[in-house]
Each structure stands twice: as C-alpha cells, then as structure tokens.
From Swiss-Prot:
Pfam families: GYF
Name of the protein in question: GRB10-interacting GYF protein 2
Organism of this sequence: Xenopus laevis (African clawed frog)
Organism phylogeny: Eukaryota, Metazoa, Chordata, Craniata, Vertebrata
Compositionally biased region (Polar residues): 241-252, 888-900
Function: Key component of the 4EHP-GYF2 complex, a multiprotein complex that acts as a repressor of translation initiation. In association with EIF4E2, assists ribosome-associated quality control (RQC) by sequestering the mRNA cap, blocking ribosome initiation and decreasing the translational load on problematic messages.
GO CC terms in record: cytosol; membrane; perikaryon; proximal dendrite; vesicle
Assembly with partners or alone: Component of the 4EHP-GYF2 complex.
Residue stretches of biased makeup (Basic and acidic residues): 153-181, 257-272, 318-331, 678-737, 843-862, 914-933
Biased composition (Low complexity): 863-885, 901-913, 934-948, 1060-1077
Domain GYF: from-to ranges: 488-536
Transmembrane portions of the chain: none
Protein's gene: gigyf2
Amino acid sequence: MTAETQTLNFGPEWLRALSSGGSVISPPLSPALPKYKLADFRYGREEMLALYVKDNKVPSDLLDKEFLPILNDEPLLPLALVSFTEEEQRNFSMSVNSAAVLRLTNRGSSGGGGTVVGVPRGRSSSRGRGRGRGESGFYQRSFDEVESGFGRGAREMHRSQSWEERGDRRFEKPARKEPDGVRGSAWREIPDRRRRFDYDLRESKDERGYRRPRSGSGIAEDERDSLPEWCLDDAEDETGTFDSSGAFLSSKPSKKVQKEPIPEEQEIDFHPSVDGAEVSDSDGSQTEEAKETDPVQSQNQDDDLSRNDHTVQAAPSPDHKTSSPVRRTDMTLDTAHQKAVSPHLSCKMDAKSQSPSSPPTPSKHKEDAASASHQGTREKAGPCLPHPQSPALSQRSPARQPDPHIVPAMSSVPVPQLDTPTVPIHSSVCAAPGMEPVPPEPDEDGLEHLEQQAQQMVAYLQDGTLDDDHLLTKVLDQRVKGPSLDNQQKWYYKDPQGEIQGPFSNREMAEWYQAGYFPMTLLLRRVCDETFQPLGDIFKKWGRVPFSTPPTPRLGDLDPERLSRQQEITALYQMRHLHYQQLLFQQQYAVLAQQQKVALSSQQQQLPLPLQPLSMRIPEHTVIPPVVRALSVPESTSLWELPPAPTQPAVWEGSSVWDLPVEPTTQGTTREQLAQMDKVKAAKMEQERREAELRAKQEEEEQHRRKEAEEERKRREEEELARRKQEEALQRQKELALQKQMEEEERQRKKELQLLEERMRQEEERKRLEEERRRQEEERRKQLEERKRAEEERRRREEEKKREEDERRQLEEIQRKQEEAARWAREEEEAVRLLLEEARLKAEEEERNKREEAQRQKELQRQRQQQQEALRRLQLQQQQQQLAQMKLPSSSTWGQQVTPSAASQSALSLAEIQKLEEERERQKLQEQRHQQQELKALQQQQQQQQQKIPGWGTMSKPTGTTKSLLEIQQEEAGQMQKNHQQPGRNRPANISLPVAPVVNNHISSPTVGNSGSSVWGSLNNNLSPQWSSDSMSSIWGSTDVKGSSVGFWDDAVKEVAPRNATSKNKNNASKSAGSNSRQSKKVEQEEKLLRLFQGANKCQDDFTQWCEKTMHAINTAHSLDVPTFVSFLREVESPYEVHDYVCAYLGDTPEAKDFSKQFIERRTKQKTSQHRPQQDVAWVTCQTSQANSQPITLEAVQCAGRKKKKQKMVRADPSLLGFSVNASSERLNMGEIETAEDY
C-alpha cells in the first residue's frame, strides 16, 4: 500500500498534524519518522533520579501572572518515589478503554489465558509510545493474569517501571517539535527527555520495527488470522481503498473460503453478522444510539437493521478511521485483533449439529466449544442474546439503502472475539454504499448452505421476541424524549491546546473513543451539562462508555450506592447467563445424536428440540429495567430456575414450530425453507454413511468439550475469586499504605508544628530575656547615675561643711590671734616697763662704773672681734636658710633683745655713741646689699635646679625642710634647756647699757614684740602640724619680768654670754661701749635671720593648707607629692598653664577643674592681700609705741624706713643651725651637712 493511504485523510487539520503517519488499526511494519531525530543527550531512569534536586527554585519564566493559577512553589517528588494511588493501580492494571469496553460487552479475556486480545506486550511493541505524539496508552493486564493455576501470575506493578514500559501519558501534555508548541506544565521536567520515541532507545535497529503482540493461545496462525488481510505479509500485492468511515476495501476477491458470505444468505436476505457481538451489544446499544442520533430513521428501524446486516456482516470495529485529538495506539492494536463472534454463531452451530444430514466435523465441534467458552467469558457488560430480526424485516431490508449514521454506530464498541479460521471475516467495517458482497467460491457445497440456514432459523426463533421488546421500548423512549434530545446529547471537549471542539454526536465520539483518541483525562461535557469533567470521572459515575446509546443521566445525577447496586445486579445476571448457556449446550448436544438416527419424516418434530429455550420467553408486556438493559434478560425470569431440557420434544400451542403465528412474509419464508429442506433430504441420506463414521468421534469430542467447558468455567470462577482477593489485598495494602502515609504526614506535620512552636517560644524567651537584660541595664545605669549624683551631693556637702569649718576655724584663729596679740602687747608693755626700770637702775650703776670703762676697752675690742666672728657664722646660717626658702619680713624686729651693757659704757660720750651708730648703719647697709645679692644668686640656682630635674611630680616626697630644721631646733632647744635652766638670771649684772641706747632699745622692743606676736601667732596655725604649741613654747620660751626672753635665736646670745662671763671672771673688767654695739649688731642679725624663717614659713598659710587638703582628697589614684605640686603651682603665673597642669596630673575630671578654678581665685586673693597685713603690722607697731608716749630714737625711725627695702642676705652660723650648706666650688647648691662638732 502506498504512503498516501497510511495518513489520515479526514478529520480536523490539527488532528492530522498530530497523526503518527500510520493506520488506525495497526502501525506499518517499519515506523516512518522523518520529522524527529534522536536527542543529543539521553538519560536512564537512575540518571534522571540522580539529577533530581529537591531544592530547585521556580524558574523565572514561570513567575509570570499567566502561570500563577497552576504554579506550585514546592517541586513534586519523582513518581518512582511515590507509592501508587488506588486509581493509578486500577488504571495500570487494565487499560481504561479496554476495561470500559469489557464492562460494556460483558466480556473478560479470551479463552487462551494470555493477554487481552489486542493488548501489546513488551516494550516498543507499538508506535506512539513516545512523548509528543498525541497518543496515550495504559498498561493492561489480561483478565486471566491473576494468581491461578492456569495462567501466568499477575505482574506486580511498581514505580520502577519506566514511562516507556507503562505507556502512561496521563500526566503529560504532548510537546511539539516546533518551537512555538505548547510546553508541558511540569516545570521540573527535563526537556531533553520530553521528546522520546515509542521504541526503546537501547534496542537495536532491527528491533525497532513493528512487533505483533502475542495472543492468548500463542499460535502464530491465530495471530495471522486476527489481522486484516491488507496488513499481512502475503497481501503485499493487494491494493484497495478506504471508504468515508476509514474502512479498508480490497479491490481483489478474497482467496479464503471461510471469509466469504454464504450465497443463500443473499437469497433469503437474512444476513446475521459474524460480528454480531458488536452489532448486538449488551442491550442493543448501537441500535439505540442510532435511534437517538437520528429519530426520523428510528421509525424505520426494521429496515435499518436488515440493511446493517448487509453492510456490517464481518467488519471489525477497529477499522474505523476517525479523527480525534488524542490517539490511543493501545486501543488501536486492541481493536485490530478483536474479531466479534455473535451468539448467532453458537445458535447456527447448534442448528447445524441438529441437522441429520450434516454430521459435525471435528473442526465444527471445536468451533462450537470455542464459541461456548468464549461466550462464558463475557462478564463485564454483556449481551447474551443476539439482536432480533423478524422474517418480515429481513425481507423488506433489501429494498432500502443502509443509513450511514447507523453503520458506524452499530460497531462503535469493540468486543473481544474468538479467533476461528472457519468463521467468515471481512477486513473492512462496512462496504461502500451500493456495493454487493463478493460472490462465493464455486466449490461451496450445498451442505454448508443448509447448515447456515438452520443456524439462521435457530437464531431467529431464540431472539425474535426479546428483540421485539427492545425495539418497542426504544420507540417509546424515543417518543418521550422528543427530537430535541439529539442536540442535548451532543458532546464538547477541550483539545490539548485548550480549545473547545464540538458539538459531536454520540456516534462520532464513540468512533474516536474506540480508535483510542480519548484519554481518561480528556475534559468533555454534553450540551445539557454545565461544566467540563474528565472522561475517567464520567466512566466511574455512569459505569459504562458515556458515548453509548442508552440515555445517560446528567453528570452528577448517579450516586455511588445506586451505581454499586447496578454493578452487583449485573454480575448476578452474568452468572445466570453462563449457567443458561451451559444448559443450552447440553440440550443441543443431547438432541444431536437423536437427530442423526431419525428419518426424514420426523424432521418437523425434531426441529423444536433446539428451540427448547423458547419456553423461557416472557409475556409481551414485560419491560426490561434500566439497570439491566445491557443484559437483554427479563427481570422476572430466574435463570437458575430454568427447567431442564426434556429428552422429548417440547410442544407449545402449535404442533410444530411452523404453527407459530407469523406474518405472511414470514410464512412465505418458512415454506421456501421447507422446500429446500426436502431437497436436502436426499443429499443427507447419501451422506449418512459418512456421518456414521464420524459419529463416534463426534461423541468423544463432545464429551471432551463438556469437560473443557466445565474446567473453563471452574477456572474462570477461580480466576475471578483470585482476582477479587488480589484486588482486595491490593486495596487493603493501598489503604494501609495510605493510612501510614497519612499518619506519617500527620506526625511530620505535628513535628513541624512542635518545632515551629518551640522556635517561636525560644524566640519569645530570647526577646523576653533581651528585654529583661535591657531593663536591668537601664536600672543599673539609673542606679549608677543616682549613686554618682548622691556621691557628688555628699562630696559637695562635705566640701561645704569643710569650707564652713575652715571659715569658722579661721574666725576662731583670728580671734585667738587678736587675743594673743593683745596679751603679747600687754606683756611687752610690762616688759618694757620693767626694762626701763632696770635700765634706770643700771644707768645709775654704770655711772658708778664709768671709771672701769676705760679699763675694759680692750676687753670690749676683743668681744667685738668675737661678735664679728659670730656674725660671719650667722651669715652662713642665713645662706642655709635661704636654701630652704625661708624669709623673715623686714618689719619683724621683735628678735632684737636688749643686752645689758657694762656700766663703763655710760661713760662714753655722745659723739662716740653717734659714731658707733653711723658705723653700725653702714655695716647694716653693706650686709643688706650683700644679702640681696646672695638671695638673687640663690634664686637663680633654684630655678636652674628645677629646670634640670624633670618629672618632679613622680619623685618621692622629700622630707620638708621645715621639719628637718624643726628637729634640729628642738635638739638645740633641749641642749639649751639643759645647760641654762635659768638663762635670764644667769646673765652678768655688771653689763649695762648707756642711757640713750637703752631708751632706744626699750622703745623699739615693744614694737618688735608686738610685730613678732602677730606674725608668729599666725605661724602657729599656718605651719605644718610639726609646729605644735608645745614645741613653740619650748623653743620660743616666755618673757621674764626683767624683759629678757628666750627666743628662737637666743642660743647665740647664750653662747656669747658665757664667754663674756668667762672673760669677765678672768679679766675682772667691765664691758665697754664697743661690746654694746656688738650686742646690738648681733641682735639685728638674728632679727634678719628670723625674717628669713618667717618668709619660709609663711607659705603654710590658709591657702596652702586648703590646697593640700583639697589635693589629698582628689589625689586618691595618683602617686603625687602634694606639697611639691602646690609649691610648683604657686610659681606658675598663667591661669591656663595652671589648668593644664592640674588636668595633666590629677585627671580631666570635674573635681580637678573646680580645684584649678578655685586655686587661681584664692591665689589671686592671697597675692593681693599679702603685702597689706605687713604694712598694717608695721603701722600698728608705730602707733603702739606712740601710745606709750616713749621717745623714738633715730634708730627706730631708720629701721621703720628700711622695712620696705629688700633685705640683704644674712649668713647663718653652722654652729647654730647644726649643719652647713656651703656650696662646693664645682657645683652650685651642692653642699654637705656639717654638724656643730666640726667647729
């Protein structure tokens, strides 16, 4: 055949584009695939599973709004890792189309015990298995593949089967090779594996061709006969065409005698179809569908049926080439191998076997047994009786043309058929309109013709009445439904591109479904329905093919309970039908032996015997219920209660079958038949001999067939039981697996929920702890600030308290000083008075001793030299004091003490006294100038020393110079107290002063005392704590009645006095006026030295004490020498530098800044008020002396005038100080301590 005949030449263009290029019935021997090429990269199942990544994100191409309704964020697991659902297991166990057809036709599998006829086994056995071919297939197990002892064990279904093994395309959309084709909806699908071919990629090239499936019997000849002749190997030279329905019409006459119609059938116009199972579907569904789709032609149903017998007589339904959006090659192959054998065949065999003149041949017996066994297997939806036809209808049928709508409808449902070589089979569905069947071969003998006639009569008598009932019921239904039902029953469906196609009639939909174009996922609806539903759901609800003729309810009208009840009743009637068939066969076989022995005269009495089942006919008013319309069995008839077949002929109202009331056309037909049978009698008598020889063999084969039928029935019952058990086990297993999966999912969900709750609780706990910690830190910070504020407040209160205490103490000190000054003033006045009195007495005594003055002049000269020596020592002592930065104010003149001079001094003249005074003034001036120079030099040395020693703040605290000097003074005072218990009284009485000098000294003495009391009183309080009152009392002593006082520098006088006394004792001479002048010089030198000490100790005033106290409070974390730092700060003039030094050494704190500020203010006040008290003291002294109305000498005036002048450096005697600070010749101010023993 040419390539043009292999492609679809009808149907929509898009459907022809999806065609794989082969025939609907079966693919060509070698697939022609010019449009596809192999993928560059091909992967196996394990490789694809290894490539699966669970965490893959959704591609950006699918995030468009267009895909949001169908987009799933989480990727699906590979199906190999997912267990079967109940629906998948059922679908994989049997093809959905095949299962539906089997349920509709009440048939299981063929009697061979293999696969369902037409279902390919193995991989790559059919084309269209690849993706993108627009075809779909399901894995199918044959009915007898259950676990029984007769057939092969059931094949267990696993996910390990590849898509190619399963042929499952339900979850995929067909992809196109063109770039603009619709892509699949699964985003995780690998595009390289999307377009695969229908054959295995691992097969060799010679294995890729078309492979014919095995039949149940495994006989190659059966396989060959099950195929249409145009696709056989020996039909290469045949040519033919396809009619409008897609059926193949051969242009040459068939060579097989068995596949030609009987010429006598044409003569009597009674043509029972060999494919009667297709025509007489369970309840005449094709006829009913034809009536529904064409109500006008349903009025002439009798003519249509007779004409259908002409056109359909041997056509297998798969030859219809109709277009549909989705092709199913499985169904194509399935229907290609199915050959329908109607119950007419069995009835013909029975009638033929009853004929005495035609003994059955072995092949005919086998045919009868096979037909019986085949009828016993139609359990799913099954029609058991053939479609009725009356003789009148068969006579009128040649006068009418067949209805083109009825022809395909009558073969719309495929039925598994028995492969028998003796049954006439045509390869086409129906002949072209107007074509006559091919004439029979001339070698066909009359015996075969008579047998066919007998079979036709038996079929007519058995089924005539039942089919009349069906026709009457359908006509009534048609009248009730009205002409509008045709449009309401039309179908719409959505093609893979999402476009709605339709409307189409039931006939067209049934043809496309039968050809395998519709998958179970196809969305369709009728005109009367509102929504689209998948084809699989409609199958479940209706329990049959929705395109069949019986009136279908609206989608959703059938409830599950009613459906299950219908299925149970259907199964019951199937079992009853099996039993009825077995009884019928037994009766026929029993009568067969008697027919061969009876003479021709008894032929009419024997004819009713095979018609014995007619006793079970029901009244005409019986209506078949809608639940069992597909059974063609009366509801009120119990097949189990059928009476056993009598051995004698059963007689009804008439004496024979010819007495039945029939129409005139029927009586004419029977007369012709009787005439023909008379002619046959002679021929059968000639063949009695041959039949007698075959009789024994026939009986033996009959018994064998009975046994086989019984065994087949038992086997099928066992298979059914095993299948049910297996299904129940699978169902239980699925339920358990589903329950486990649900439990696991529930546990997983609970676990995830617990984890989520735990995570949320931890998060809340962490937030709470964080909040608590933050609150605690805030409270801690507030408490710290509160403590700091309280500490500052406490410190401020303490400072305020200290300040108030200092002010109070200062006031008390001022009062005490004032009282002390007043007391000292009184004491000084008393001392002056006593001194004046004593001076008067001494003056008188001096007058008496004037004569002795001349004698003691020499001694006086010697004393003067000693006094000069003491003065030098005093100057050395002043140098040492200057090193300690001790200065005495120039106004302090209290250190001057009045030394009683000798009586001989009074004898001096006034000129001498004046000369002595001038000389003393000149010496004082020189000493002052020398002292100033030394002070300047000492200051320069101290400045250089301070510059040379950096980091004085970190040096260890040096011992205060005042403290060491105090210790020395205390030691000296102790020695003086031991040596001179009464220093005032031990003085020599013969020493007297001249009158004038005495008055001068006495007048100046109160001034000095008053000034000293005010100065040293303040020193008592302002010096460091070493200067206690006890030490002062022991050092400074107290004034006696005579006016002599033990002062700080009285030791020099004490040393001089004993020496003078010793010299006086040795020389027994009185003191001269020169000794008086020396004494006055010594007093002045001591006064200067005291001024130095007063200047040094003045640093320990209130300001210094405040500085040290405040710095001790601040300097808690610093190792700082406070006195040294205070003395250093006092020398810093710039306030900014003071602030920088304080912040550098005490820290940049508010306390340090406050201290620097107060330090600058207090120092400014102290400097401004430093000079005024000294001047006030000097003026107070002068006023006090004036109040006493004492004459002021020139010396007092000169001393008062020199107070404002800068004093000269006074050298201190090392013997008085106890140490020497003489600088070495090489280095300045680097001396060594010298003790008193060194002199």
